[in-house]
Amino acid sequence: TKKGKWSEVFGKDQPLYIEVGMGKGQFITELSRRNPEINYIGIERYTSVLYRALQKRELLTEECGEEFPNLRYLCVDAKDLPNFFGKGEVDRIYLNFSDPWPKERHARRRLTSREFLARYEEILADGGLVEFKTDNRSLFDFSLEEVKESGWELLVCTYDLHHDKELMEGNVMTEYERKFS
């Protein structure tokens, strides 16, 4: 297992950022291109979606000659993250346009539920961050409440990311975000 040994996998002891539910991988690939001093891991639970991300990465490598040595992928369910990362090993977690699981009986499946926040707490380094973007107001409100109830500190909050100059600076848009915003 690579748990606690991701620096060895990358061959460089650098901060580790992960994206949970990376979809087609545009966001995390662009981040890895812009920030070679950070190691990135894209997490996707569906092999078919992960395969599409790998194809896109290959195409970029062929077209641009970029290798993305600071980017890896994991095909796992987010509930299993503590089995793949050591305590304090992850410096940042990105949650971008996650499935809102709109039915109340599915609330525990939301990636911002207390159960998931507890899992993230296990793997986040001291001072580690979770960055969350959604266009679903119900999920947003639910997430704010879960953060509060879990005793987490909310550093920045906006209801309109794309009209906030300060937050948009350096924002990498996901494929979904580009399409629908």
PLM feature spans:
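S-adenosyl-L-methionine
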Residues: 1-18, 26-33, 57-87
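Conserved glycine-rich SAM-binding loop
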Residues: 23
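Conserved SAM/SAH-binding beta-strand->alpha-helix loop
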Residues: 46
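A short acidic, Gly/Pro-enriched loop at the edge of an enzyme's catalytic core
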Residues: 83-92, 97
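A short glycine-rich, Lys/Arg-flanked "PGG" loop and its adjoining helix->strand segment in the class I
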Residues: 112-126
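Conserved beta-strand signature within the Rossmann-like core of class I S-adenosyl-L-methionine
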Residues: 126-134
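Class I S-adenosyl-L-methionine
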Residues: 143-145, 149-181
